[in-house]
From Swiss-Prot:
InterPro entries: CASP/CASPL, CASP_dom, CASPL. It comes from Oryza sativa subsp. japonica (Rice). This is Casparian strip membrane protein 2. Homodimer and heterodimers. It is found in: Cell membrane. GO terms for cellular component: Casparian strip; plasma membrane. Regulates membrane-cell wall junctions and localized cell wall deposition. Required for establishment of the Casparian strip membrane domain (CSD) and the subsequent formation of Casparian strips, a cell wall modification of the root endodermis that determines an apoplastic barrier between the intraorganismal apoplasm and the extraorganismal apoplasm and prevents lateral diffusion.
């Protein structure tokens, strides 16, 4: 057959690089359009946590955000407990009232150093107030790092010691305040609050403030025990 159809002619590379390769004149006619590149956001990988508040970031563990929130509450409660302990120590330390009978040369006096229980109360509350201030940096460390197990354990032990110290001091002072208000007929102790109103008001308020600090410390102990990380034991399969 002498007829030649040029529509399907094969072009060969002139320089010999196209041996065995043929290109049809219709190569680009039915080529599909390139798929659009997937949309890439401006946010880099791993930067999605920047929009999450610091206290709620999990950091790879679901309970870390909750532990940071409880750490912040721990810090606030320590600041709040500093006030009652300091106020209780100052209130008892400045309690001094004199009662004049007939003349100024014959006086009765009610002062805190007349009662050893009140002296112990002042020392215990002063120690507790100082401890609250010193524990604030450690409490802040538990907020920044929820895995600070050693710091949490140290605070838990010291808080327990402070609870025992404050409870003993507040209980001893409360017993003295009760006797001052009610007296003891069997021991022939008369109530002195009928005459020394200011002294009894100061001591009563100080005891209430100290018990309030004890309650705050007990809450701190419960929170510390709740946020303490627990070890999981894996059994061999």
């Amino acid at each position: 057959m002498s007829g030649s159809d040029t529509s399907g002619s094969v072009h060969v590379d002139e320089h010999g690089h196209g041996h065995g390769k043929a290109s049809s004149s219709y190569d680009g006619a039915g080529a599909p359009a390139p798929a659009p590149a997937p949309f890439q956001g401006h946010r880099k990988a791993g930067s999605g946590s920047s929009d999450v508040p610091f206290l709620l970031r999990s950091g790879g563990s679901g309970g870390d955000g909750l532990r940071r929130c409880l750490g912040l509450i721990d810090f606030v409660l320590r600041v709040a407990a500093f006030g009652p302990t300091l106020a209780a120590a100052i209130s008892i330390g400045t309690s001094d009232e004199r009662l004049s009978v007939f003349t100024n040369y014959f006086q009765f006096r009610a002062r805190f150093d007349d009662f050893p229980a009140f002296e112990f109360f002042i020392v215990a509350n002063a120690i507790a107030a100082g401890y609250m201030v010193l524990s604030l940096p450690f409490s802040a460390a538990t907020i920044m790092s929820s895995k600070a197990t050693g710091v949490k354990l140290l605070l838990l032990i010291c808080d327990t010691i402070m609870v025992g110290l404050l409870t003993a001091a507040a209980s001893a002072a409360a017993a003295m305040v009760y006797v001052a208000h009610e007296g003891n007929l069997r021991a022939n102790w008369v109530p002195i609050c009928l005459q020394f109103h200011g002294f009894c008001q100061r001591t009563s308020g100080a005891v209430i403030a100290s018990f309030l600090a004890v309650f705050v410390l007990m809450v701190l102990i419960v929170m510390a025990a709740f946020t303490m990380p627990r070890r999981t034991h894996h059994t061999a399969s």
